[in-house]
């Protein structure tokens, strides 16, 4: 029986990170977490490229562009959506999620989802490095593992 698993070893892998500037007081923590996870697992800074975009809605387009470039083993998407008084949150969250998934499926490049969707600012802060860990770190680990899995399936 053959079992394929990804190891959390980022040596030799190249990563694209897309980070939203909207809610930057939170997304900056996600970015720090993602970079820390990549470096601690063997990536080097020159193999990490960061693209800043205005908001989370813009992330899927840039993810597609980076994935199609052929320069990266995985793409990490980081953003924060906080529910407001209108349905805007629901539309943006749904479209960003669909867009990120579609990029991965269309390009066969792992695209990890580090987008916080929270009802309150407090919940978002908790997911960006306090009580609930750091979703940027988590997204980076997913990117490493999936890049390794995909490498074995070629």
UniProtKB/Swiss-Prot annotation:
CDD domains: Lumazine_synthase-I. Keywords: Riboflavin biosynthesis, Transferase. 5-amino-6-(D-ribitylamino)uracil binds at residues 22, 56-58, 80-82, 113. Transmembrane segments: none annotated. Catalyzes the formation of 6,7-dimethyl-8-ribityllumazine by condensation of 5-amino-6-(D-ribitylamino)uracil with 3,4-dihydroxy-2-butanone 4-phosphate. This is the penultimate step in the biosynthesis of riboflavin. Gene3D superfamilies: Lumazine/riboflavin synthase. One of its GO terms (molecular function) is 6,7-dimethyl-8-ribityllumazine synthase activity. HAMAP family: Lumazine_synth (MF_00178). Its EC number is 2.5.1.78. PANTHER family: 6,7-DIMETHYL-8-RIBITYLLUMAZINE SYNTHASE, 6,7-DIMETHYL-8-RIBITYLLUMAZINE SYNTHASE DMRL SYNTHASE LUMAZINE SYNTHASE. This is 6,7-dimethyl-8-ribityllumazine synthase. It catalyses: (2S)-2-hydroxy-3-oxobutyl phosphate + 5-amino-6-(D-ribitylamino)uracil = 6,7-dimethyl-8-(1-D-ribityl)lumazine + phosphate + 2 H2O + H(+). Belongs to the DMRL synthase family. The keyword Transferase applies. The gene is ribH. The active site is at 88 (proton donor). The keyword Plastid does not apply. (2S)-2-hydroxy-3-oxobutyl phosphate binds at residues 85-86, 127. GO terms for cellular component: cytoplasm; cytosol; riboflavin synthase complex. It comes from Thermodesulfovibrio yellowstonii (strain ATCC 51303 / DSM 11347 / YP87). It comes from the Bacteria. GO terms for biological process: riboflavin biosynthetic process. Pfam families: DMRL_synthase.
């Amino acid at each position: 029986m053959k079992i394929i698993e990804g190891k959390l070893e980022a040596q030799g892998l190249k990563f694209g990170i897309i980070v939203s500037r909207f809610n930057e007081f939170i997304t900056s923590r996600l970015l720090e977490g993602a970079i820390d996870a990549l470096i601690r697992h063997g990536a080097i800074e020159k193999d990490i490229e960061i693209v800043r975009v205005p908001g989370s809605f813009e992330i899927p387009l840039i993810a597609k562009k980076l994935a199609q470039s052929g320069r990266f083993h995985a793409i990490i998407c980081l953003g924060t959506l906080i529910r407001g008084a209108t349905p805007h949150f629901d539309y943006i969250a749904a479209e960003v999620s669909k867009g990120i998934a579609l990029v991965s499926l269309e390009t066969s490049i792992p695209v990890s989802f580090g987008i916080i969707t929270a009802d309150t600012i407090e919940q978002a802060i908790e997911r960006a490095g306090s009580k609930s860990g750091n979703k940027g770190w988590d997204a980076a680990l997913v990117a490493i593992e999936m890049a390794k899995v995909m490498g074995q399936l070629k």
